[in-house]
């Protein structure tokens, strides 16, 4: 069997079959499929920067309300579908996460809307 044939066979397997294959390989060869954790080398900063670029989920943090609290509350209500009291409590509790684990596009849109209302926003 060639490598290409093995790859084709593996591609056709279900997740359960792949899991069983990994377990069988671990048992047969006495190895572990766990990822080894190593300390970053001198280029660790570059690796950290690359990992930061690959981030897919972001949190929109309300840092400061600014002078126009009412507009910020309205913007929070539109973005989160919260009631008036919940949105007011969130705004008054700043710094506070307004949206969590959202896409880059959604985080940018939320930041734009909240900054237009007068708030200071941070995306993490």
Curated annotation (Swiss-Prot):
- State the UniProt keywords alphabetically: Ribonucleoprotein, Ribosomal protein
Give me the Gene Ontology terms describing cellular component. cytosolic large ribosomal subunit
| CDD domains found in the cross-reference section | Ribosomal_L7_L12 (cd00387)
Respond yes or no to whether keyword Ribosomal protein is given for this record.
Answer: yes
Q: Which residues cross the membrane?
A: none
> Example GO biological process term?
translation
Q: Which GO terms describe its molecular function?
A: mRNA binding; structural constituent of ribosome
Give the multimer and partner information. Homodimer. Part of the ribosomal stalk of the 50S ribosomal subunit. Forms a multimeric L10(L12)X complex, where L10 forms an elongated spine to which 2 to 4 L12 dimers bind in a sequential fashion. Binds GTP-bound translation factors.
Query: What is this protein for, i.e. what is its function?
Result: Forms part of the ribosomal stalk which helps the ribosome interact with GTP-bound translation factors. Is thus essential for accurate translation.
Regarding protein family, the annotation reads: Belongs to the bacterial ribosomal protein bL12 family.
Q: What is the name attached to this protein's record? A: Large ribosomal subunit protein bL12
Q: Species lineage, top-down?
A: Bacteria, Bacillati, Chloroflexota, Dehalococcoidia, Dehalococcoidales
């Amino acid at each position: 069997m060639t490598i290409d044939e093995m790859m084709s066979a593996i591609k056709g397997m279900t997740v359960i079959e792949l899991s069983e294959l990994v377990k069988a390989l671990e048992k047969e060869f006495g190895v572990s499929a766990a990822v080894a954790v190593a300390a970053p080398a001198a280029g660790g900063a570059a690796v950290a920067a690359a990992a930061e670029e690959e981030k897919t989920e972001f949190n929109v943090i309300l840092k400061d309300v600014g002078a126009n609290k009412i507009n910020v509350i309205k913007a929070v209500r539109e973005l989160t579908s919260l009631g008036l009291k919940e949105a007011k409590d969130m705004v008054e509790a700043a710094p506070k996460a307004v949206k969590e684990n959202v896409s880059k596009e959604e985080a940018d849109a939320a930041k734009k809307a909240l900054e237009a209302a007068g708030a200071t926003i941070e995306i993490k």
